[in-house]
C-alpha cells in the first residue's frame, strides 16, 4: 500500500546543538536504510521549510506507523499521512 507522508520537523530551541546534529545523522542513516530496503520509495525536500514529502510502500497503516516511529526525529515531527490509490487515468 502506498502512502504520501509529509513530515515537518519542529525542534525545540532548547535542544543542544550536538544532540541535534547526532539526531540528524541518525535520521539520515535510518532514512537511507529504509530507501535501500525499497520501503521509502521517494523523498523530496519542501523548498523553504524544514519538511519533506515522501512515498512509503508498506503493508498497512500499522506498519507505516511502526516505521515512522523508528525515525530519530519522530518526537519532533508533525506528520500528515495520506493513503494513495491508483488513479484510473494513470499510465503505468
Predicted feature residues:
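Conserved, structured core segments of small domains
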Residues: 1-92
Amino acid at each position: 500500500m502506498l502512502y504520501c507522508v509529509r513530515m515537518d520537523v519542529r525542534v525545540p530551541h532548547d535542544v543542544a546543538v550536538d544532540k541535534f546534529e547526532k539526531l540528524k545523522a541518525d535520521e539520515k542513516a535510518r532514512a537511507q536504510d529504509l530507501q535501500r530496503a525499497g520501503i521509502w520509495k521517494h523523498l523530496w525536500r519542501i523548498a523553504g521549510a524544514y519538511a519533506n514529502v515522501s512515498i512509503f510502500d508498506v503493508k498497512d497503516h500499522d506498519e507505516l506507523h511502526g516505521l515512522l516511529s523508528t525515525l530519530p526525529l519522530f518526537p519532533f515531527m508533525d506528520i500528515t499521512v495520506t493513503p494513495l490509490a491508483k488513479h484510473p487515468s494513470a499510465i503505468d
